Amino acid sequence: MINFPTGMYEWSMLASQLTAEKTIRFQRFLRRFRLAYCFDGMKLHFLDQNTIDGYDALFSVFLSYSSYELLLSSISTYYDDASIKEDRTKYSILNPGIAERLKRDAKLEEFLHLEDKNHPLTQQVDRFFNSNDADILPLLEAIKDKVKHGFFSIGGMKPDSKEHSKDIWDGSRELLVMTEDIFHNFVLCES
């Protein structure tokens, strides 16, 4: 089906056997995935195009990452295993090109800096910017957290270039592909 993740037929067979609580969680994921998949930017007036591109990239990450989180939470509920939604270390998005370009963006690094140095996400973001690690998933999570907690101000982060906004946008699209793969593999295993 268009703009739904691969595996919808298998999902419909599986859903007919689930409790309402478990089905509702997956339905939330499917609606968020569809929104993230269909998101093509915002229509904003009186702002320059670089600012609009930055907002579009940040909001795309928010939608894609929250879709990913909803899927992990749904699978966690399905198996009655809370560790599934908490253990995100088994997934990664390796993209050396995007990683290398974004590591050069000092404004992005400053924007993503968290006050709590002991927070696991702070350590992941620091590791991303200070190593050869090409996994952009922790970076996307940090962006999602900043948007979610009200730091949704492109003025505070304004990417160094249009290319960086595009890289952030492309990272969010890669996250959607990974999320779709996780969903598809899940329904294939369970149906």
Model-derived regions: residue spans:
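Charged alpha-helical initiation segments
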Residues: 1-58
